[in-house]
Amino acid sequence: MKVLLIDDDEALTTIFTAALTKEGFQVVAVNTGQEGIDKASTEAPNLILLDQVLPDLSGNDILKQLKLDEKTKNIPVIIFSNFSQEELVKEAINQGAVDYVFKYQVEPKDVIEKIKRALGQT
């Protein structure tokens, strides 16, 4: 199973890439929204972990684009967010995100469980 991780926090990306790889996932990590949109289309991930705040686009703008594209509209998206962005998370869920994670207060194992649940593996 392939996970696309779209996040500009290098330390967090390293931690989650290692944890997901250890669990048998293939991880494609990018740090801008446009790279994420491009990789979602070309890499055909099984799931996307999407940060809400990126240097070039908001997570919700990326989610909108993903849901409009035939190639990516059915890929489950889990939002990575901070507590200060709860309204954005609610908006993302309304736009089709399957779940959310408050990224700085969660263990990788909890994210892996959410991924497995979203992929129907639990």
Task: Place the predicted regions along the sequence by residue.
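Active-site beta3 strand of CheY-like receiver
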Residues: E43-L49, L54
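Alpha4 helix (beta4-alpha4-beta5 surface) of REC/receiver domains from two-component response regulators
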Residues: D61, S84-E113
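Conserved acidic carboxylate
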Residues: D7
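Acidic catalytic/metal-coordinating carboxylates
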Residues: T32-E35, S58-K64
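The feature encodes the CheY-like receiver
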Residues: T13, P55, Q85
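Charged docking surfaces used in two-component/phosphorelay signaling
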Residues: T14-K22
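Short hydrophobic/Thr-rich beta-strand motif most characteristic of the beta2 strand and flanking loop
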Residues: G24-N31, K39
